């Protein structure tokens, strides 16, 4: 399996993307108004390709005018959430299927940069990477939420852009860019006039981790959070049909994956636009998960999971579903939540956590906090501290507020930076004051081993609660399910020793033969390249004969 820039995804939980408008309505009222919402696509102005040469950066030299497509090297880099990572894998898969070679940045002819708009620092590094590529004579194609949400940004002028719903057209954009052209595809996809979730899930992939399939079950959301820029890029909720998601899961297991991550801007809102629901989808997926394989449910905001708590709790108890849920609270203050337009109250969040902890043995709840939101008072922050101190979340993602251009929160009066840093430090100190795994030494678990640790010194497995267990790097261990005993612990993980002999390690049920078009590796990729080269030679020969015929006549 060809790899992207990194060998495997990191051990962090990446899909932490909460997704703006006004109208001061109470959170519960706003939520009640949306319970029967039908999402309709908004008309958007099509952005035409750049034609003003004076506004463009110095064009890169044209390196591709060959009749043989896909003979260059492409470097792919991704920022942001699991949804973005999945999009990059799809784009890499199509490029590989067409014959392009995925490579490191130095040897690449073209850089494909897939961006994230959640925070200022990630956009800053994205901009710096563009400048680096341009200064090194690379052709640049940008993708993701930054150009989709702010396509007229000065530093994007003259660059080719792939919109978040146009990733299935990456090959033609790359080809035209290599010819020296600038192409911008930012339109929404529609079927019978209705906006759909995006590119087909059946596209080929080059997975960053060949053992893990990331499936985007919907794009966009139903929220209007005042701090969020992602809403500008991903838009309103649009869900994939359950059958398409199940087919993708089945195909992924057939290709050798042993773990599936469901991701979106809000998995809890899944299906509201198509007459389905998250529990309905989960029960259908459970039916196709092979023995010893696992499913992880992605981030869900509190309002939309409240209606389905009973069913979600039952699904999380299933032996092939991780007892894990990421539910971002963002603040422990009802006042701040109202200013954020989060559409729930603190008690709603507490009910979700209490219910799941009572019904799902060993469940892990992860959450997010934004420190220093413009309206946050000292009393508001103390409520957040109390909430986090009560639940002692094993996974707590602490973020300083960043004013994103074009959002209502960016127009609010900001809290002094030193006060934001002080509050962030206090909450961070609280988080590090407790050890979630302190009493685990000697405990035994069954773990599924799917990743390599950041330091490249251990394999990483997860138990039923999706808690990290570091294991020695032994041959043939990746992709297996093993029994372990915990020998030591740290703040974020446990270290285990393997109790089984290698002959007792178990793998996912034997994979089926996968269709060639979805397996872009080794022999199949070579066949595809040979096919394109053969077609090109035939076309070239016909052109040569036609030219001779014209001269003769």
Swiss-Prot record:
Residue spans of biased composition, Basic and acidic residues class: 23-32, 47-58
Domain MTTase N-terminal: 72-179
Domain TRAM: 438-500
Catalytic activity: N(6)-L-threonylcarbamoyladenosine(37) in tRNA + (sulfur carrier)-SH + AH2 + 2 S-adenosyl-L-methionine = 2-methylsulfanyl-N(6)-L-threonylcarbamoyladenosine(37) in tRNA + (sulfur carrier)-H + 5'-deoxyadenosine + L-methionine + A + S-adenosyl-L-homocysteine + 2 H(+)
Cofactor remark: Binds 2 [4Fe-4S] clusters. One cluster is coordinated with 3 cysteines and an exchangeable S-adenosyl-L-methionine.
Top-level class of the enzyme under EC nomenclature: transferase
Keywords: 4Fe-4S, Iron, Iron-sulfur, Membrane, Metal-binding, S-adenosyl-L-methionine, Transferase, Transmembrane, Transmembrane helix, tRNA processing
Cofactor field: [4Fe-4S] cluster
Disordered: annotated segments: 21-61
One GO MF term attached to the UniProt entry: N6-threonylcarbomyladenosine methylthiotransferase activity
GO cellular component, one term: membrane
InterPro entries: Elp3/MiaA/NifB-like_rSAM, Methylthiotransferase, Methylthiotransferase_CS, Methylthiotransferase_N, Methylthiotransferase_N_sf, MiaB-like_arc_euk, rSAM, rSAM_horseshoe
Gene3D superfamilies: Methylthiotransferase, N-terminal domain, tm_1862 like domain
Pfam families, alphabetized: Radical_SAM, UPF0004
Record-listed E.C. numbers: 2.8.4.5
Keyword presence, Iron: yes
Transmembrane segments: 533-553
Family matches, as SMART domains: Elp3 (SM00729)
Chief location bin: membrane
Similarity comment text for this entry: Belongs to the methylthiotransferase family. CDKAL1 subfamily.
Listed name of the protein: Threonylcarbamoyladenosine tRNA methylthiotransferase
Upper classification of the organism: Eukaryota, Metazoa, Ecdysozoa, Arthropoda, Hexapoda
């Amino acid at each position: 399996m060809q790899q992207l820039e990194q060998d495997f995804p990191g051990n962090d939980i990446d899909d932490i993307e909460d997704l703006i408008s006004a109208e001061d309505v109470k959170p519960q009222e706003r939520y009640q108004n949306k319970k029967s919402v039908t999402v309709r696509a908004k008309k958007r102005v099509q952005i035409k390709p750049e034609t003003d040469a004076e506004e463009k950066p110095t064009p890169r030299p044209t390196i591709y005018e060959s009749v043989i497509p896909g003979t260059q090297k492409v470097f792919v880099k991704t920022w942001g959430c699991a949804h973005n990572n999945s999009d990059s894998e799809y784009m890499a898969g199509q490029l590989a299927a067409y014959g392009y070679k995925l490579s490191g940045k130095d040897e690449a002819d073209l850089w494909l940069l897939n961006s994230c708009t959640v925070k200022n620092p990630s956009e800053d590094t994205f901009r710096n990477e563009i400048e680096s590529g341009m200064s090194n004579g690379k052709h640049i194609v940008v993708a993701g939420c930054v150009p989709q949400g702010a396509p007229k940004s000065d530093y994007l002028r003259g660059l080719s852009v792939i919109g978040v719903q146009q990733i299935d057209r990456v090959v033609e954009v790359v080809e035209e860019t290599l010819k020296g052209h600038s192409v911008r595809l930012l339109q929404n996809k529609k079927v019978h006039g209705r906006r759909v979730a995006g590119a087909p899930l059946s596209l080929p992939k080059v997975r960053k981790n060949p053992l893990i399939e990331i499936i985007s079950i919907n794009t966009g959301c139903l929220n209007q959070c005042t701090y969020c820029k992602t809403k500008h890029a991903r838009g309103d909720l649009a869900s994939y049909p359950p059958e398409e998601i199940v087919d993708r899961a089945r195909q992924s297991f057939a290709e050798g994956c042993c773990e599936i991550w469901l991701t979106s801007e809000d998995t809890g809102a899944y299906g509201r636009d198509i007459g389905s629901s998250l529990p309905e989808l989960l029960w259908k997926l459970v039916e196709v998960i092979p023995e010893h394989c696992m499913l992880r449910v992605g981030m869900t905001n509190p309002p939309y999971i409240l209606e389905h708590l009973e069913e979600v709790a039952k699904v999380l108890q299933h032996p092939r579903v991780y007892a894990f849920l990421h539910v971002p609270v963002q603040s422990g203050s009802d006042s701040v939540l109202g200013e954020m337009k989060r559409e729930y109250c603190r008690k709603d969040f507490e009910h979700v956590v209490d219910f799941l902890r009572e019904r799902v043995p060993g469940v892990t709840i992860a959450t997010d906090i934004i420190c220093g939101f413009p309206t946050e008072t000292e009393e508001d922050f103390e409520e957040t501290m109390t909430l986090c101190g009560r639940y002692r979340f094993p996974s707590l993602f602490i973020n300083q507020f960043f004013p994103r251009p074009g959002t209502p929160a960016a127009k609010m009066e900001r809290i002094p930076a030193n006060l934001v840093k002080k509050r962030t430090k206090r909450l961070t100190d609280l988080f590090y004051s407790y050890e979630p795994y302190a009493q685990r030494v000697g405990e035994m678990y069954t773990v599924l081993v799917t990743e390599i640790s950041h330091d490249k010194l251990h394999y990483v497995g997860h138990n039923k609660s999706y808690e990290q267990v570091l294991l020695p790097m032994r041959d043939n261990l990746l992709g297996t399910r093993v029994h372990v005993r915990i020998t030591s612990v740290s703040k974020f993980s446990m270290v285990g020793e393997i109790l089984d002999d290698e002959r007792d390690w178990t793998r996912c049920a034997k994979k089926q033969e996968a269709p060639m078009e979805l397996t872009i590796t080794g022999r199949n990729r070579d066949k595809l390249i040979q096919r394109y080269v053969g077609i090109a030679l035939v076309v070239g020969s016909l052109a040569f004969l036609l030219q001779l015929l014209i001269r003769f006549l």
